[in-house]
Amino acid sequence: MKINLLVLTISAVLSITACSNKDQKQTSQQKTESLETENNIQKSDKKMAKPIHLTKAEFLQKVANYEANPDKWVYLGDKPCIIDFYADWCGPCKMVAPILEELAQEYDGQIYIYKVDTEAEMELASDFGIRSIPTLLFCPMGEAPQMAQGALPKDAFKQAINEVLLKKS
């Protein structure tokens, strides 16, 4: 009887231990996979430059404080930029959005690409006289900005970036 009880106890302890070790192995493997996934996401986020959405307050800090300088354009950025005045419902704006994302990656470190939602930032859009969308404002360093309206093809954007913003012929 004592031998049966001893065998039963040992087998119970072994089965519990075996099951709990299996769970720990799975948990550590899941943690490792989770960390690898997080690291891959963080690495890909660092590589993926994207357009930056601006509010009016951010515009006044990063681009130009036209309230403090109403008579003169003073660009505040350290790199040239493109500002896309858009709306979520606008078909041509939806056509331009992926082009701007590609250009943000292609010209990462050389220019900024900003986006201003005209529905959310009506005052800012009004201050710049935005009547049709998409409207794009090209802001070179040390010069007056240039405005373009409508959905431009990627080569037109690249030409404007190279000639107006980066001064490449």
Regions found by a protein language model. Give the residues of each.
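Thiol-based oxidoreductase modules, predominantly thioredoxin-like and allied folds used
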Residues: F85, V96-A104, D108-E123, I130
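C-type cytochrome heme c attachment motif
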Residues: D88-M95, T135
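Non-catalytic, surface beta->alpha helical segment in thiol-disulfide oxidoreductase systems
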Residues: S132, L137-S169
